[in-house]
């Protein structure tokens, strides 16, 4: 019997909603450099499926992992945490 994996969830800010049913979000991580001990900000962009086009630029959103929807889309919009 296969074990079901828990789907990953992430929170990020919408940086673009110019495509149909697709938004781009940016997730920022704070990582401490192992040798220099300086805090570094790392950013990563995710293409997210937004079925009803409800999010706008600047919104804080929560996304969840899903099956591949296109070449770059592996995430789906779960909810809008905070409107701009």
Swiss-Prot record:
Role summary: One of the primary rRNA binding proteins, it binds specifically to the 5'-end of 16S ribosomal RNA.
GO CC field: cytosolic small ribosomal subunit
GO molecular function, one term: structural constituent of ribosome
Gene3D superfamilies registered for this protein in UniProt: Nucleic acid-binding proteins (2.40.50.140)
Name of the molecule in the record: Small ribosomal subunit protein uS17
Domain of life: Bacteria
Subunit structure: Part of the 30S ribosomal subunit.
Cystine pairings recorded for this chain: none
A Pfam family recorded for this sequence: Ribosomal_S17
Organism the protein comes from: Karelsulcia muelleri (strain GWSS)
InterPro entries from the UniProt entry: NA-bd_OB-fold, Ribosomal_uS17, Ribosomal_uS17_bact/chlr, Ribosomal_uS17_CS
Keywords of the record: Ribonucleoprotein, Ribosomal protein, RNA-binding, rRNA-binding
Listed NCBIfam families: PRK05610.1, uS17_bact
Family to which this protein belongs: Belongs to the universal ribosomal protein uS17 family.
GO biological process, one term: translation
Transmembrane segments: none
């Amino acid at each position: 019997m296969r074990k079901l994996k828990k789907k990953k969830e992430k929170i990020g800010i919408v940086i673009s909603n110019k495509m149909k049913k697709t938004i781009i979000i940016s997730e920022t991580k704070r990582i401490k450099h192992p040798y220099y001990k300086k805090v570094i900000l790392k950013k990563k962009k995710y293409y997210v499926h937004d079925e009803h086009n409800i999010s706008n630029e600047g919104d804080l959103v929560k996304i969840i992992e899903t099956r591949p929807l296109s070449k770059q889309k592996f995430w789906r919009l779960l909810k809008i945490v905070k409107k701009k």
